[in-house]
Amino acid sequence: MDFNKENINMVDAKKAKKTVVATGIGNAMEWFDFGVYAYTTAYIGANFFSPVENADIRQMLTFAALAIAFLLRPIGGVVFGIIGDKYGRKVVLTSTIILMAFSTLTIGLLPSYDQIGLWAPILLLLARVLQGFSTGGEYAGAMTYVAESSPDKRRNSLGSGLEIGTLSGYIAASIMIAVLTFFLTDEQMASFGWRIPFLLGLFLGLFGLYLRRKLEESPVFENDVATQPERDNINFLQIIRFYYKDIFVCFVAVVFFNVTNYMVTAYLPTYLEQVIKLDATTTSVLITCVMAIMIPLALMFGKLADKIGEKKVFLIGTGGLTLFSIIAFMLLHSQSFVVIVIGIFILGFFLSTYEATMPGSLPTMFYSHIRYRTLSVTFNISVSIFGGTTPLVATWLVTKTGDPLAPAYYLTAISVIGFLVITFLHLSTAGKSLKGSYPNVDNEQDRAYYAEHPKEALWWVKERKN
């Protein structure tokens, strides 16, 4: 491949920060919806699965509706990934946030089982399916867009900003549920209170749409289209054949990230209420505080990843959860409130290492012309099988074994696998150009350096297979 120094991408760091805000709103929307659903599962179950008398089974059905929707995420990933690689990242990101806002609003408007019978859970499932389909193109698109718009040397620190949206969305959901449960009686929450957050989610979606319409296309995508007008026509089977190792590493990384993520954000509130017997308000406050602490932690680990490499930060997370998952869950059973808080914080601390590094690292595993679709499909298949099913699996493990520490064993096993895969198969890409692209720089000094060192600028050429 002939090197042309004029193709080195000069990006504006300030504009990159605005990009993080606009894309982070979509993450906030996704996790606001998910957080509200997780916190209101008891009310949703009572409204849509009221004929089921057993509370545990009703809870599992409510989580199952969530898990089934995750099966649509890979389909959304395929559709939006192909569109994103062909027509650009921006068009997908503006579409997905509209669909997410609509599905969230729909859940808040649905009649209950007592009003329309079996149609109630069917419509609930369809709303979750639409949510799953749209989010199939959302997060991978946001990661890709931010990675392609950021200076290479700051990719992880800026990427970690995406998770501010994720955590903020969940915090907003937690605060809203805490406020509602404080001012409304349980009967009022079951009747109409649980619907309020879903209805308000519409405004968050509209705000995100407003910001995203102002985005420009990512400089990497524009540069690649300009320099490679006849982009490689490669199908998914060829992608798997050429890049199976990268796909496998990405798949495993998404597994240990999302099992931990959904364990803490989706399952832990239910665990604290049903197993530990904390009240809903206390649970909401605890989770909210831990999420708030995770925001500066994620930003800190993002900066650290740019300095020492994301691989080492990955290993801090997987190694830490291998050693401390069981201990953290044991602390949750303490009679001391402070000790319970420490147990939750341990889980949140190590989760923040993933929140910091995944957005800036996963897009680097794939070449530009296949990045969106490959990341989107790999990410969503992994999330569908392991992430979205985590609350259901954890609930089933506790019910089946009678051991309240069963979720910790599951988390430990996943962390061990992640630690081994990252140790032996992952190549750190912090500070390097994205595969298939020229470097992204934000100053003339870096631009001049890469102009004089083309092999470092295009380090990926020697391993490209198509």
Curated annotation (Swiss-Prot):
Top-level taxon: Bacteria
One GO MF term attached to the UniProt entry: symporter activity
Alphabetical list of InterPro entries matching this protein: H+-coupled_symporters (IPR051084), MFS (IPR011701), MFS_dom (IPR020846), MFS_trans_sf (IPR036259), Sugar_transporter_CS (IPR005829)
Keyword list, A-Z: Cell membrane, Membrane, Symport, Transmembrane, Transmembrane helix, Transport
Disulfide bridge positions per record: none
Coiled-coil region list: none
Family: Belongs to the major facilitator superfamily. Metabolite:H+ Symporter (MHS) family (TC 2.A.1.6) family.
Protein's name according to its UniProt entry: Putative proline/betaine transporter
